[in-house]
């Protein structure tokens, strides 16, 4: 199968989740994500101005005109942090369903079924493994995010925090979603990261378009399962199974 560009993988993923046989595996995580989104956005709307004021540096009177220039950067920074939080929480909650969705997408793409049939018992059995994998992602994400968060409070340096958050976010989108098919095939965490680095530009292309799509409220709810499907197609087309051969 020929490789695609990053945007094409997400677009094809969106088409795949519309197939009748995959809708059940989309509907459950979609409902969970909707609940998480409603709760988080409600809280963020109440605290938004406070968070922006907290991050904004204090400027002397003679530089007060710069406030109108840097303020949009800090608004964007808060939006990026809220986005990260929603994505992280939603993916932890939906992880077992996303793993099953990835399996079923791979069956459709390859035209053969190498996975156990769906059952609620099988889903429950997946929870410890998928939760463990999500905790591994969290352990990868949090130290790096903490460094960026500290930079966000350092005057002067915090001006570059927003673009660094965005670049990190793009990479994390590739890690987050391509890990589902990798984990289904029992590819180790470090091996998965090494494989992604070997496909760095393709991963950044997929991660970039996914990042942009997930920034759009409500649209992001549909794009999360589309990203799972697109990442699974990425795994198949970019020959991820070769990473399993040592």
Curated annotation (Swiss-Prot):
CC per GO annotation: plasma membrane
GO molecular function: high-affinity sulfate:proton symporter activity
Keyword Cell inner membrane tagged: yes
Entry's Gene Ontology BP terms: cysteine biosynthetic process; sulfate assimilation
Membrane topology note: Multi-pass membrane protein
Keyword Cell inner membrane set for record: yes
Residue intervals passing through the bilayer: 24-44, 69-89, 148-168, 214-234
UniProtKB keywords: Amino-acid biosynthesis, Cell inner membrane, Cell membrane, Cysteine biosynthesis, Membrane, Sulfate transport, Transmembrane, Transmembrane helix, Transport
Subcellular compartments: Cell inner membrane
Record-stated family: Belongs to the CysZ family.
Functional description taken from the UniProt entry: High affinity, high specificity proton-dependent sulfate transporter, which mediates sulfate uptake. Provides the sulfur source for the cysteine synthesis pathway.
Protein name: Sulfate transporter CysZ
Species name: Pseudomonas aeruginosa (strain LESB58)
Biological classification of the source: Bacteria, Pseudomonadati, Pseudomonadota, Gammaproteobacteria, Pseudomonadales
Gene that encodes it: cysZ
């Amino acid at each position: 199968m020929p490789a695609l560009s990053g945007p094409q993988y997400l677009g094809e993923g969106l088409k795949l989740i519309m197939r009748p046989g995959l809708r059940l595996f989309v509907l459950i995580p979609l409902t969970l994500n909707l609940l998480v989104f409603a709760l988080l956005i409600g809280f963020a709307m109440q605290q938004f101005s406070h968070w922006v004021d907290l991050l904004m540096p204090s400027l002397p009177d003679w530089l007060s005109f710069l406030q109108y220039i840097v303020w949009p950067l800090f608004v964007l920074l808060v939006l990026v942090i809220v986005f990260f939080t929603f994505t992280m929480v939603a993916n932890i909650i939906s992880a077992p369903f996303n793993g099953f969705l990835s399996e079923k997408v791979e069956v459709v793409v390859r035209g053969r079924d190498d996975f156990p049939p769906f059952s609620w018992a099988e889903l429950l059995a997946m929870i410890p493994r998928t939760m463990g994998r999500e905790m591994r992602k969290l352990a990868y994400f949090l130290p790096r995010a903490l460094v960026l968060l500290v930079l966000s409070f350092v005057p002067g340096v915090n001006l570059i925090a927003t673009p660094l958050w965005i670049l990190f976010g793009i990479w994390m989108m590739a890690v987050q979603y391509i890990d589902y098919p990798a984990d289904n095939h029992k590819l180790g965490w470090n091996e998965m990261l090494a494989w992604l680095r070997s496909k760095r530009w393709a991963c950044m292309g997929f991660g970039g378009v996914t990042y942009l799509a997930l920034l759009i409220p409500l649209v992001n709810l549909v794009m999360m399962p589309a990203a799972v499907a697109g990442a699974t197609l990425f795994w198949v087309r970019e020959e991820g199974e070769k990473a399993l051969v040592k």
